[in-house]
UniProtKB/Swiss-Prot annotation:
InterPro entries per UniProt: Leu-rich_rpt, Leu-rich_rpt_typical-subtyp, LRR_dom_sf, LRR_domain-containing, LRR_R13L4/SHOC2-like, SAM, SAM/pointed_sf, Znf_RING
UniProt source species: Homo sapiens
Name of the protein in question: E3 ubiquitin-protein ligase LRSAM1
Written domain comment of the UniProt record: The coiled coil domains interact with the SB domain of TSG101.
Catalytic activity entry: S-ubiquitinyl-[E2 ubiquitin-conjugating enzyme]-L-cysteine + [acceptor protein]-L-lysine = [E2 ubiquitin-conjugating enzyme]-L-cysteine + N(6)-ubiquitinyl-[acceptor protein]-L-lysine
GO biological process: autophagy; negative regulation of endocytosis; positive regulation of autophagosome assembly; positive regulation of xenophagy; protein autoubiquitination; protein catabolic process; protein polyubiquitination; ubiquitin-dependent endocytosis
Mod. after translation: Ubiquitination promoted by PHF23 leads to proteasomal degradation.
Subunit comment: Interacts with TSG101. Interacts with PHF23. Interacts with FUS.
Pathway: Protein modification; protein ubiquitination
Broad EC category: transferase
Ranges of biased composition (kind: Basic and acidic residues): 291-314
Ranges in a coiled coil: 254-380, 510-562
Length: 723
């Protein structure tokens, strides 16, 4: 049994019944009965004890509750001293109070269907007790004090675990009815117990050495004595008083039965009205149910139609999503291959020692070229060289003007659209005339100013430099790749797919690192060219007239390396092949070893490694492309030029169809990468170190962190989109 338990809270109906019964017992003219049965009580309330004590109640009915004890705390059993009938059946009592003998007026005690383990010994003090019902409990024995119940007439102990009766029960001479389980009895024997109450009492009297007398001889004196005690103030005899009392009790019980019958009639009337209301309610429910079924059927049809449309739309979305995922996957593969190729090219340029040798040779050659002869001075085409210098400076200036005009043109596009065509033509004519005047003036000024000639030569030298040109092309390619990677990342976020997000981030960081390295190499190469120019200026004859014009003319007339190699005997297709594979720095090696397409077709990757081509991927690619060119030449012999023929420089061949294009799909290429801040202008700035291309030039100025990845911005790099 748990030490702590929560009291069961009575229902609302039980609480109302308890209040009604308590009020009914307190009314004027109420009978001596207090009925608090079926109120779901876990203990008898204090008010019931007070009512019994103050109003001298004689009957207390507390059956069919949840009582676990008869006497709650702060209550005394003396408050029930006037009680004659105590009905406690159908509860959960485990024991009766030890001072139960204080209820000296008690005549009827009913504790049927409880959980009593034993009876208190003080029960022998209930000298007026006539009926004791302890049926269906857990009693194992009766106390010896039961023999002191001299007025007991009815005793019911069936439904218990009692196997022996106390011998003291023979002293109860008034016992008329004894109910027990004869089959379970040991003492008296079951045969005696099955013979009836008289046989049991005779057996007990014989065992106790007493003479048996029937109860009728002892019952009348007991009743007379009870009558005397109960009518002390009555002048009549005991028989009259007993008759009057019995008549009074009969009248009270008849009144109680009448009230009970009246309540029953009211209950039947209420049930009839309730049944009528339930019928009406059932009809309304049936009507409502039919309408509800119709509405549900309509809703089901509409829902099925909506679900069908929704499933069709979902299938369409899934197909579109799958198509976009395939497209993004293909784009990622293309970008990965291009990034791998860029990394291989960069590694190849780092490891190649021939580049350093060629740069040193080029530096020596530049110094040799800077020596000016008298013949070159006489054959100087002053006007043409000045025009070329002017054109070079003009192109540099135009590039800066175009960049400035590009930004202003985007901001003032609406205002310029409103201006008339006539004004535009007039302005253009004026600008052209001013430009022609400036050009003529600049040409005459270039012929006289050595500093401007030197600047033009420096610009042409940077433009003609092979290594600087390769770095510029790689920077432009990486800018394009970063732009496409940013578009791809934004596309993935809109599609809510994150499966390859980490791979895209790694590729972007690799490209950012490569871009920073190329920018440093570009700056370093420009510094080297300026140092060469400084050395040439220091070694030049200070009094030599038109020194920089002559150097500019030499550099302008100088043939490209690929054209020189072709004139020396290298095949045009082989030169174009190396340029296409970004392996121009191997041209001097191939020319030195006099390699041709036929020789390369007979070589292995190990032979190319011995020659100086250290990259394994490039070795296999060169051999594969050479084999494709020879196979095409066998089908069309006129494609292969004869050896020794001097081939005029032409544009490089188109790449074979087998080469997978590195550009992204057309659908992704035409999409404009808009600024993620203003969502209006095109993205123009690269943020380093993260590599995102997500902002225009106006919006990036106040930013300190990247809007996409929240990384700190270490450097901003402007890119120009080709129109």
């Amino acid at each position: 049994m748990p030490l702590f338990f929560r009291k069961r809270k009575p229902s609302e109906e039980a609480r109302k019944r308890l209040e009604y019964q308590m009020c009914l017992a307190k009314e004027a003219g109420a009978d001596d009965i207090l009925d608090i049965s079926k109120c779901e009580l876990s203990e008898i309330p204090f008010g019931a004890f007070a009512t019994c004590k103050v109003l001298q109640k004689k009957v207390l009915i507390v059956h069919t509750n949840h009582l676990t004890s008869l006497l709650p705390k702060s209550c005394s059993l003396l408050s029930l001293a006037t009680i004659k009938v105590l009905d406690l059946h159908d509860n959960q009592l485990t024991a009766l109070p030890d001072d139960l003998g204080q209820l000296t007026a008690l005549q009827v005690l009913n504790v049927e269907r409880n959980q009593l383990m034993q009876l208190p010994r003080s029960i022998g003090n209930l000298t007026q007790l006539q009926t004791l019902n302890v049926k269906d409990n857990k009693l194992k024995e009766l106390p010896d004090t039961v023999g002191e119940l001299r007025s007991l007439r009815t005793l019911n102990i069936s439904g218990n675990e009692i196997q022996r009766l106390p011998q003291m029960l023979a002293h109860v001479r008034t016992l008329e009815m004894l109910s027990l389980d004869a089959s379970a009895m040991v003492y008296p024997p079951r045969e005696v117990c099955g013979a009836g109450t008289a046989a049991i009492l005779q057996f007990l009297c014989k065992e106790s050495g007493l003479e048996y007398y029937p109860p009728s001889q002892y019952l009348l004196p007991i009743l007379e004595q009870d009558g005397i005690e109960n009518s002390r103030d009555s002048p009549d005899g005991p028989t009259d008083r007993f008759s009057r009392e019995e008549l009074e009790w009969q009248n009270r019980f008849s009144d109680y039965e009448k009230r009970k019958e009246q309540k029953m009639l009211e209950k039947l009337e209420f049930e009839r009205r309730l049944e009528l209301g339930q019928r009406e309610h059932t009809q309304l429910l049936q009507q409502s149910s039919s309408q509800k079924d119709e509405i549900l059927q309509t809703v089901k049809e509409e829902q099925s139609r909506l679900e069908q449309g929704l499933s069709e739309h979902q299938r369409h979305l899934n197909a579109e999503r799958q198509r976009l995922q395939e497209q993004l996957k293909q784009t990622e593969q293309n970008i990965s291959s291009r990034i791998q190729k860029l990394l291989q090219d960069n590694q190849r340029q780092k490891k190649s020692s021939e580049i350093l040798k060629s740069l040193e040779n080029e530096r020596i050659r530049m110094e040799q070229l800077m020596s000016i002869t008298q013949e070159e001075t006489e054959s100087l085409r002053r006007r043409d060289v000045a025009s070329a210098m002017q054109q070079m400076l003009t192109e540099s200036c135009k590039n800066r003007l175009i960049q400035m005009a590009y930004e202003s043109q985007r901001q003032n596009l609406v205002q310029q659209a409103c201006s008339s065509m006539a004004e535009m033509d007039e302005r253009f004519q004026q600008i052209l005339s001013w430009q022609q005047m400036d050009q003529n003036k600049a040409i005459s000024q270039i012929l006289q100013e050595s500093a401007m000639q030197k600047a033009a030569f420096e610009a042409l030298q940077v433009k003609k430099d092979l290594m600087h040109r390769q770095i510029r092309s790689q920077i432009k390619l990486i800018e394009t790749e970063l732009l496409q990677l940013t578009q791809l990342e934004l596309k993935r976020k809109s599609l809510d797919t994150e499966s390859l997000q980490e791979m895209i981030s790694e590729q972007r960081w690799a490209l950012s690192s490569l871009l920073q390295q190329l920018l440093k190499e570009k700056q370093q190469r420009e510094e080297e060219l300026r140092e060469i120019l400084t050395e040439l200026e220091a070694k030049s004859e200070t009094r030599q007239e038109n020194y920089w014009l002559i150097q500019y003319q030499r550099l302008l007339n100088q043939k490209p390396l690929s054209l020189k190699l072709q004139e020396e005997g290298m095949e045009r297709q082989l030169v174009a092949l190396l340029e296409e594979l970004s392996a121009e720095h191997y041209l001097p090696i191939f020319a030195h070893h006099r390699l041709s397409l036929d020789l390369l077709s007979q070589m292995s990757p190990g032979d190319l490694a011995k020659v100086g081509v250290s990259e394994a991927g490039l070795q296999h690619e060169i051999l594969r492309r050479v084999q494709e060119l020879l196979d095409a030449a066998r089908i069309q012999p006129e494609l292969k030029p004869p050896m020794g023929e001097v081939v005029t420089p032409t544009a490089p061949q188109e790449p074979p169809e087998s080469v997978r294009p590195s550009a992204p799909p057309a659908e992704l290429e035409v999409q404009a990468s808009e600024c993620v801040v203003c969502l209006e202008r095109e993205a123009q700035m690269i943020f380093l170190n993260c590599g995102h291309v997500c902002c225009c030039q106006q919006c990036c100025q106040p930013l300190r962190t990247c809007p996409l990845c929240r990384q700190d911005i270490a450097q901003r790099l402007r890119i120009y989109h080709s129109s």
